Amino acid sequence: MFWGATGFRETTMTVRAILDTKGHNILSVPLEAKLSAAVKLLAERKIGAVLVMNSGRIEGILSERDIVRVLGERGASVLDEAVSTVMTRKVVSCKQSDTVAAIMEMMTLGKFRHLPVVEGERVVGLISIGDVVKWRVQEYEHEQEALREYIKTA
């Protein structure tokens, strides 16, 4: 165990373990989808981002932050435009074999909250900062329980 550059404790827990728990569901919209339809999807599913896909490939990611930014800059008329005009095009992704600590560091340094999980050319999941925080809380709860048991038997 060691500390990463952002101060996160490095462990061997991988992205695969989170996906195995939360599932591999991937919500996406096509490039030509209207921003208003994507906003509706985010609201209905209570999620913060959706992948923008074309023929099975990631073309971008659309987050709540992207939407708020463009609404502030250009007003409500942007809701009639295609998501391709608003999405983030430079998508950072991870692999299932990446450690949770490594993706925490990626998210912190990159200042983003969602990370597509890609194996080869195939998208296999989407990890959010909420997923990571949930895992970290569970990890600490397990550690505390193990310490309590150790103290009882000492």
Set out the residue ranges of the language-model regions.
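Tandem CBS (Cystathionine beta-synthase) repeat/Bateman regulatory domains
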Residues: 1-154
